[in-house]
Structure formats: structure tokens, C-alpha cells
């Protein structure tokens, strides 16, 4: 979660940097490679803008991107679930090496890496979907600020290339970010202070960025995080995971009771 927050902070800083670096209009005659990519994104959104509604184009564009990432997200979710399940084992290994000297740290890391390999866990997989989305977000921001037909497009109550005057989109983006993080946290067998704090900090960070960036970017975050909530409920429903975990624990308890009952009967004979 901390790595994810750091990546989002980097994305925000990159957006600010791009704002300063690229300010000239992008057209079909632009020769710079990055400008051509930006214009290509703009053309895709334009193609998806049914009825000339740029907002519809951004919504459909976001859904297409998220749908394309589904296989990767599915792998990430399964890896995260396995990571959550082995947390008790990781804590045992950490308790085994309380010393902070280099040799103890090396041995501890070796055991943890071995545990990861045995359970097919990649601790960096959770950040991969976000890393893939970062260039998309940067290109979208540039398209909204440098391509005229997107910059001056309107949808519902807001202008695509300007800030949302009502703050509705930034608030919705923050709400869906919270729901997404909360659902992922809810299924964890154990919760730590860092995960809990990031669940509340990240929505605030998204809210601040949503207020300061173009409404089109905030709309992208709203749809992207709403899709994430839907995806979590579909692929990693925390309520089903908790129910399955409790059922597994109950089965183990029933086995223990059955063994104890069998032992009592054997003693009576």
C-alpha cells in the first residue's frame, strides 16, 4: 500500500512536470514522438465520443483501458491474496531474527524470499497495474490540455479541460478510491497500521489532485476507481473470501472435536 501511494505521488508530480514542459498545441502535423502519442490518444477519445460528447469518449476510453488490464489485475489480485495469507508466516520469520545486524537481515530476507517463491507471491505485482496506467494518465492529461477539440469539450455541467467548479468529480473520485482500498483491506486476515492509514490517506490525495487538475482527469479517476470496485467485488469479493476463510477454520475445529471425541470413546473401551 505504501508503494502504491508513492507511485500515485510520483504520478501527481509527473503531471505537474508535464504541465510545465508541454504547453504548445498538439495537432495532426506535430512531429514530436510524444506529441504524436498524445494526439493518438485524443483521436481514440474522439472516435468514442458518440454524439460529440467528449465525456462519453473519456468514460468509454477508461473502460477499454481497465478491461484490457483485467488479466493483469486478476494476477495482481491473486498475488495480493496469497501475500495476505502468508503474513502470519512472515511475522514468524521476522520474530526469528530480532537482531538488526547485516547477517540477520540477510538470513531473514532469504527466508522471506523462499516463502514468496513457495507460495508464488510477487511483492511488486501490486504496483504493476498502476505503473502501466501512469503513461496513459500522462498522455490523457496532455491531450486534455493541448488538443483543442478535447480542451474545449463540454459534458454535463463541466468543461473537459477546466477544473470542475462544483468539486463533484473530485469527491466521487475520492469516494471510489476509498471504497476500492477498503474492500481490498477488508479481506486481509490481519490489518496493520500502514494499510489502514493509507486507506484513508489515498482518497484525500486523490481529492486534492482532482480539485487541481482538469475535470476530464477527475472523470477518468471516477470511472477507473468505480471499475476497480466492480472488479474487486467480481474477482476478489471480500465477503466471500471471509466466509470461505471462516468455513475453513470451522472445518478444522470440527476435525479437532471429532478427534477428541474419538479419543474419549477409545479410552472408555
UniProtKB/Swiss-Prot annotation:
The lineage of its organism: Bacteria, Bacillati, Bacillota, Bacilli, Lactobacillales. Keywords: Cell membrane, Chaperone, Lipoprotein, Membrane, Palmitate, Protein transport, Signal, Transmembrane, Transmembrane helix, Transport. Disulfide bonds: none annotated. Pfam families: 60KD_IMP (PF02096). GO terms for molecular function: membrane insertase activity. NCBIfam families: yidC_oxa1_cterm (TIGR03592). The keyword rRNA processing does not apply. Residues 1-20 form the signal peptide. The keyword Transport applies. Belongs to the OXA1/ALB3/YidC family. Type 2 subfamily. This is Membrane protein insertase YidC 1. A lipid is attached at residue 21 (S-diacylglycerol cysteine). Required for the insertion and/or proper folding and/or complex formation of integral membrane proteins into the membrane. Involved in integration of membrane proteins that insert both dependently and independently of the Sec translocase complex, as well as at least some lipoproteins. Its main location: membrane. The gene is yidC1.
